[in-house]
C-alpha cells in the first residue's frame, strides 16, 4: 500500500535504527500517529537536541554534552592507573554495568579496517599515543571485540603501549557462563582452551 509522501518518509527514516525493518518502522510510525503524538513530539525535540549537543569527551572520546564525561571528570577514576581501550561508547556502558572496573577509558569509535579506509588516524591512535605518554598508567586493558579486526587493533595498540613500559592485558573471551560446550563454535572453544588458567 502506498502512503502519503510524509508518512513514507517517516517510515523510511525510522529504518535507520538498528534492527528496524520496513514492517517495524511502519508499526512505530502508526503508533506515534495514532496514540503517541505528544510523546512523538518530545522524542523529536530530544533527538534534535541530542544530535546537536552531544559530542565527544576530550580525554576518552565517549559521548557527552560536556568537554569531559563524568568518568574523566572524576579524579578517583585515574587513581587505579588502569586504562581500558574499547571500540564504542556502548562498550563503556557494558563494562560500567559490571561495577568491577574503576579506571578510565579510551574509545576508538571502531577498529582497524584497511578495506573500509579505517586506519590508525581514523581511530585517534595519535591521541591515544599522547594519553599513553602521560606516565600515569600501570595497565592498559585491551577490550576490543574478539574479531579479526578487533584482534588486529589490539595487537597494534599493544605495540604502541610497550614503548612506555606499561603492563598490557587483553580481556578474556570464550565459553559464556551457562553455555553448553556442544553449542559453542570451534573458534570460541579454541580461544577458551588456549586462554585457560589455573583453578584457584
Swiss-Prot record:
CDD domains attached to this UniProt entry: TOPRIM_recR
GO MF annotation, one: DNA binding
Alphabetic keyword roster: DNA damage, DNA recombination, DNA repair, Metal-binding, Zinc, Zinc-finger
Pfam families tied to this protein: RecR_C, RecR_HhH, RecR_ZnF, Toprim_4
GO biological process: DNA recombination; DNA repair
The keyword Transferase belongs to this UniProt entry's keyword annotation: no
DNA damage is among the record's keywords: yes
Family annotation (InterPro entries): DNA_Rcmb_RecR (IPR000093), Rcmb_RecR (IPR023627), Rcmb_RecR_Znf (IPR015967), TOPRIM_dom (IPR006171), TOPRIM_RecR (IPR034137)
Zinc finger (C4-type): 57-72
UniProt domain Toprim: residue ranges: 81-176
Function: May play a role in DNA repair. It seems to be involved in an RecBC-independent recombinational process of DNA repair. It may act with RecF and RecO.
Family: Belongs to the RecR family.
Matching NCBIfam families: recR (TIGR00615)
Official protein name in the record: Recombination protein RecR
Source organism: Tolumonas auensis (strain DSM 9187 / NBRC 110442 / TA 4)
